[in-house]
């Protein structure tokens, strides 16, 4: 059957480059105001429509605070049933706790899930949880390190997600 899906949020699902310094400086109120200026990566809308249409269980695992993740999910109407934010499981990525929490919320075992992210910590957390890990190269700021992160798969375009979840 189809895999349950775990996504990182920033630079994986949505290009939030414009919010990076605000997030780094924990200027959350200003970041919230500027979510409308972020952009969905090319091809991601189609991927999310397939996830929605097939009722594929989907979680976001992020090191950002819950209100930030919730606001982006609402802004883009993402087909996400579960959010594991900075506030929801500790220690955060690269520790597996957030990934294990996502599995628990979705009611699936690690072998029935697949995880997508743009950072080494995404790959490390997924691997530590026993989840198939996918390095997403379209938004990453860690290209060199990500190449050597021990991922299960590497992809360069969002539409490649569909071949991996089927």
Which residue ranges define each predicted feature?
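Short, acidic loop-to-helix structural element flanking the phosphoryl-transfer center
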Residues: 32-60, 67-70, 74, 96
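Acidic, Mg2+-coordinating phosphoryl-transfer loop and its flanking beta/alpha structural elements
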Residues: 115-154
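Surface-exposed amphipathic alpha-helices with a cationic face
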Residues: 45-53, 103, 123-127
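A short, structured active-site edge motif that brings together acidic residues
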Residues: 79-93
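Conserved Lys-Pro-Asp/Glu-containing loop-to-beta segment of HAD-superfamily phosphomonoesterases
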Residues: 95-123
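Active-site neighborhood of HAD-like aspartate-dependent phosphohydrolases
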Residues: 1-40
